[in-house]
Regions:
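Positively charged, small/polar-rich N-terminal and surface patches that mediate targeting and assembly
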Residues: 1-109
Length: 109
């Protein structure tokens, strides 16, 4: 199993979740997060924002093919414009060693 973590613009979350659901990936965890990338924040007038609001989506997939599908959906849907822009986000993929259902205490992987 693999965990796909995507940090994206808040205004793109609805579209990404809808596309994931349509493609057969209904199980998603969403979290509000704050951070910055290469640009180290932004300046608007006299105000400097060093941490920007983002959303993190966590999707656990069973295999490489599903991982590739999820990444393709997120990339296509979360990108700003045809070429993308600073602040569109990042996607991280990591292995999931094991998982447990809290209510039953059973291992689910």
């Amino acid at each position: 199993m693999l965990m796909v973590r995507a940090i994206i613009r808040p205004e793109k979350v609805g579209a990404v979740l809808s596309e994931l659901l349509s493609a057969g990936f209904p199980e998603v965890t969403k979290m509000d997060v704050f951070g910055r990338g290469k640009q180290k924040g932004i300046k608007v007038g006299d105000i400097y924002y060093d941490e920007l609001p983002k959303e993190m989506l966590l999707v656990v997939v069973k295999n490489e093919a599903d991982k590739d599908d999820v990444i393709r959906i997120i990339m296509r849907t979360a990108r700003t414009g045809e070429k993308g822009a600073f602040g569109d986000g990042k996607i991280f993929v990591s292995p999931v060693e094991t998982a447990y259902t809290i209510s039953s205490g059973k291992e689910v992987l």
